Amino acid sequence: MSYEHCISGYTNFNENIHYFYQFAYLFTAICINYRILYVIWVSQRHFYRNQSFYNLYSVDCFTSVLAMSNELIFTRSFLYFPQLCVSFSEIVKNSPVFMRIYYCLLSYLIAIKPVIHIFIAVNRMSCVMFPVTYSQNWSQKLRIMLIVIFLAPFLVIWNVLISDNFIGYVNGGFGISYTRRVTWASLSLMQFTLIILTVLITMVTTTVTFYKMTTMKKRIKASERALCIAAALISVGFLLEAITQSFFAFFKEAPWLLDVMNYLRFATMDILFVGSPLVLLLVSDQFRGHVLGSRIGRTQRVSSINNTHSHIHHNTHHTMTRYSYFLWNVNK
C-alpha cells in the first residue's frame, strides 16, 4: 500500500476484469433484492405487512441494495481501474465532504446488517416459543425495534464519524480509509465484536428454535421450518465475516494481509449480500412463488388467505378452488 501516489505495474485489463465479473453478480443481486422489496412493500403488501419476519427482512434487502450500489459505483470503480487512478484520486482527494459521507455511509451499512440479523434470529425463536402471542407482540413493538436497528450501528461507527479520512493506494487503484481520533476505538475491532455477538446470539436462538420445532404440530413445523433454515444458513455468512474481521482487528499491520485484505473483505461481504436473498428463495416455496411468479406461490397464497374464513366456508371454497384449478389444467 502507498499513501502518496498510484501504484504502477498492474495490467489494466486484468484489474478491469475483476470489476466486470463482480459487477455481474452484484448487479444481479441488486435486481433480486429490488424485486423482493417490490413484492413485500407493493405487490403483495396485503399479505406480508403483518408478518414481522418479512418486514425485518425487507430492511435488510434495502440496506443491501444501498451497500451494493455504493460498492459498484464507488468502491470497486476506484480500485479496479488503474487507468483512471490518477484522475479519480485527485478528484476524491479534493472532496473531503464526499470522503466523509462515503466512508461513514459504507461503515454504517456494513454495521447494520448484523444488527438486523440478530432481530431476525430472535424473531424466529419467539415464533416457535410463543406461537399464540408472537404475531401480536412483534406487530406492536416492530416500530421500536426498527428504531433500535437504525440507531445501533452508531455504537460501532461513532469514531468514524469524528475522524478524518485519507486516500490509500492499493492494487493499482485506491481506497478511502480514516485516521482514528480515538486510538483505541478501531472500526475493525468494533465490527468484529458486533459480528461475534451476532454469531453467538444466532447459535443460541437457532438451537432453541430447532429444539422447540421438534415438539410442534406438523403443520406449524412445516410452515416455519423454511424461515428457520434460512436464518441459520445466513448465519454461516456472518461466521465467515467474523473470521475476516478478526484478521483486520488483530493482524492488520501484517505485510501478507495488505496484499489480500480487499479480496478477503469483498469475498465475505459479497457472500452476505448475494447469498442472503438466494437462501430465502431456495428454502421457501411460497416466497419464491411470490417473487418469481411461479404457480406454487399463488396456490399457497390462496390457501393462506382462506385461513381467515370460517372452517365450513374454508373447506367449501378450498374444494371449489381445487376443482376449478383441476379443470383449468385439463383444458389449457
Swiss-Prot record:
It is a multi-pass membrane protein. GO terms for biological process: sensory perception of chemical stimulus. The gene is srg-3. Keywords: Membrane, Transmembrane, Transmembrane helix. GO terms for cellular component: membrane. Belongs to the nematode receptor-like protein srg family. It comes from Caenorhabditis elegans. This is Serpentine receptor class gamma-3. InterPro entries: 7TM_GPCR_serpentine_rcpt_Srg, Nematode_SR-like. It is found in: Membrane. The chain crosses the membrane at residues 23-43, 72-92, 101-121, 144-164, 184-204, 231-251, 263-283. GO terms for molecular function: transmembrane signaling receptor activity. Signal peptide: none annotated. Pfam families: Srg (PF02118).
